[in-house]
Amino acid sequence: MGSTVKNSLLWVFESIEDDPGFMRKRLFGFEAAYVDGLLCLSVGNGEEPWNGLLVCTSRDRHADLIREFPELAPHPVLGKWLYLSQTHEEFEALAGAVVEVVRRRDSRVGVEPAARKKSAKKNRFV
């Protein structure tokens, strides 16, 4: 059974929810934002370091994004993605600015989602 606890950071996606390319999915306890099929952002309100905004990108794009948003840092567990803790005093404004970058289809943000692994079918009737 799924969790009934609502993610308090869903408001971060409000400005792009009407975009025809937008889709939201649950992802490992986070809510993820996809735009045009690319995984772009994820929000979660758990314990640090799972308490804020994840910017889905590749390591080769980190420096450029951090130049624009110095408050972003590589996530301590998922180092390929950038992270902004919701405890940051400017979280709301920064999250809004990052979402605007996604809305503009900035090529620095967004990764192809990993293909699902097919589970081996078990023959239960042998």
Give the positions of each predicted feature.
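Short, conserved beta-strand/beta-arch hydrophobic-aromatic motifs that form part
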Residues: 26-29, 34-77
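Short, structured beta-strand-loop surface elements
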Residues: 58-119
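N-terminal first-folded block
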Residues: 2-39
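Catalytic cores of nucleic-acid ligases and guanylyltransferases
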Residues: 123-126
